[in-house]
Amino acid sequence: MHLTTREFFIDGIKRDRWVWSGDAIQSYLMNYYLFFDSESVKRTIWLLRGKDPVTSHSNTIMDYTFYWFLSVYDYYLYSGDRQFVNQLYPRMQTMMDYVLGRTNKNGMVEGMSGDWVFVDWADGYLDKKGELSFEQVLFCRSLETMALCADLVGDKDGQQKYEKLASALKAKLEPTFWNNQKQAFVHNCVDGRQSDAVTRYANMFSVFFDYLNADKQQAIKQSVLLNDEILKITTPYMRFYELEALC
């Protein structure tokens, strides 16, 4: 952490030396435990947001935009710094407006021109077409985060708006992606049809976000998390979340 902390939290001291939103949110968590360097967290969050008008996702990566939203409320939970949320909230609103302006007819996000739908590096093929279950889970959590932050700053209309959007999206997750035969969320849907692929990403996030009932969480543990036939996670970055789900 010492090596990757400058004015901001950077990734890859020997390689990228760049600020990536997905890596930063994990750096923040390690920092809260090790140093509690709040100023570096705030500077990095501001940097990753950038200026208005919004013209692209954070680092151009769809999932990294969602991690950015989550990182703001994480910071509040650890610091109690409501003033920071007040300062940042207008930028959160315009960032979410950008995301909402790119949803499809189902209210879900898909990769569009200029978007990098990343998810993770993998040793196998990861289809990025259509509605990815992983992206919808992160999107839903981001909307819930917006509602929480709206409440913190006293924006009651915004709170109701984001709660309604989050509830509507959450209600679509299981009907759209859950496959009873596979006992898991499928990786994606293309043109309204579930793919045959099952990956770990949406399944493990839905577990630690508590989006599924206890029976389905246990089903995911057996059919996905402890199943060696499911594409394995190879990066420490995503392994972090897999271990969180197992915990």
Map each language-model feature to its residues.
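Mature extracytoplasmic enzyme cores
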Residues: 1-9
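Glycine/proline-enriched, intrinsically flexible loops and inter-domain linkers
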Residues: 13-15
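Active-site core of glycosidic bond-cleaving carbohydrate-active enzymes
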Residues: 20-247
